[in-house]
Amino acid sequence: MNNYTIKDITRASGGFAMLAVDQREAMRLMFAAAGAKTPVADSVLTDFKVNAAKILSPYASAVLLDQQFCYRQAVEQNAVAKSCAMIVAADDFIPGNGIPVDNVVIDKKINAQAVKRDGAKALKLLVLWRSDEDAQQRLDMVKEFNELCHSNGLLSIIEPVVRPPRCGDKFDREQAIIDAAKELGDSGADLYKVEMPLYGKGARSDLLTASQRLNGHINMPWVILSSGVDEKLFPRAVRVAMEAGASGFLAGRAVWSSVIGLPDTELMLRDVSAPKLQRLGEIVDEMMAKRR
């Protein structure tokens, strides 16, 4: 059996410059907020995702797709560039309490062998981390996910995202990110996708300290995501996180959110989003070169 390795989803530099287009109901809300005709049809999301994959994947080391809206279509249309690896989201988002993702389980519809035949090299699992929910349940889910990936020769990418506790109103996001890393940072996955400390805001020195603290608890390669980070601050966030030990990014919003709902989507992706992704890739290479 062919077992993929981390090198299969990195750039030649060894760094990760990966594009996410697996947002689901959150993306529908983004279209609505941008003034799109509501209710926003599934086809609007599918078209955007497939176009983004076609236009942006040549600049990414990997692209993350979701089964619900775009994976099948992307495969059928050969949307992903040959030079770009494919990652498939294996998480089932359960809405509730007025938010699009209130709970997450492993998607039972995922067929690891079939996605591998289609060319996927990794699966990704979102793990919601709340201080007052059972840690063992999270660890068990990650273990099951790792087994699903590794028994099929696929890479395992976990994405712990912190949320306020179910009960009570005290929430220290920064401490929660660290606590989640303490719990899941040595859980046997191949890659850890993490929220940027301090939303990438403030003094560089503070960001570096926070990122170094995070690095101390993650015993696998790690990358940052861009949700919650101002897209103008994201390139710096990538630099600082990598200075602290990260190996790149797996991000969507910082690359394409500014073109959501604009006319001439393909043109906007080409002229606005592609240069952003290209520059981020250069930053990753630059930071990796400093490690030699």
Curated annotation (Swiss-Prot):
Catalyses: 6-deoxy-6-sulfo-D-fructose 1-phosphate = (2S)-3-sulfolactaldehyde + dihydroxyacetone phosphate
Where does the record place the catalytic residues? 193
Asked if the record carries the keyword Nucleotide-binding, the reply is no
Q: Name one GO biological process term.
A: 6-sulfoquinovose(1-) catabolic process
- A Pfam family per the record: DeoC
- The EC number(s) attached to this protein equal 4.1.2.57
Which of UniProt's keywords are assigned here?
A: Carbohydrate metabolism, Lyase, Schiff base
Checking InterPro entries in the record gives:
Aldolase_TIM, DeoC/FbaB/LacD_aldolase, LacD_aldolase, SFP_aldolase_YihT
Which is one GO molecular function term here? 6-deoxy-6-sulfofructose-1-phosphate aldolase activity
Q: Which domain of life is it from?
A: Bacteria
Stretch forming the signal peptide = none
By sequence similarity, the record places it as follows:
Belongs to the aldolase LacD family.
> Can you state the subunit structure given in the record?
Homotetramer.
HAMAP family under this entry? Answer: SFP_aldolase (MF_01912)
Query: What is known about what this protein does?
Result: Cleaves 6-deoxy-6-sulfo-D-fructose 1-phosphate (SFP) to form dihydroxyacetone phosphate (DHAP) and 3-sulfolactaldehyde (SLA).
Q: What PANTHER family does the database record attribute to this sequence? A: SULFOFRUCTOSEPHOSPHATE ALDOLASE
The protein's name is: Sulfofructosephosphate aldolase
Question: The organism's lineage?
Answer: Bacteria, Pseudomonadati, Pseudomonadota, Gammaproteobacteria, Enterobacterales
